[in-house]
Amino acid sequence: MASSEEYLAYVLDLLANVPEVTTRKMMGEYLLYASGKLFGGVYDDRFLVKSTDASRAVLTTEQVPYEGAAPMLLVDVEDADVVATLVASLLPELPEPKRRQRRR
């Protein structure tokens, strides 16, 4: 089941206090980036973030976004300030994005 644009809009409202949030649609779901780092996504109308020490300190419910994927944490918080703090705390634990080489 693909995620709805309405649910994505709701998640983006929650992320309004997070700088440089971008999305990328992929196979009916949405990947979420902040400052170029992939930190989570919207999968089957569920807002999930990567599991890091910082995110595990706030969230407890693990869910698998799709078959074969690593478990992620369900964001069941509706307070935009809490969500912004959560994302800000987990970003330093994520790797820097890999730079793509240009084709010649």
Language-model segments: residues:
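Charge-dense, helix-prone N-terminal extensions
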Residues: M1-R104
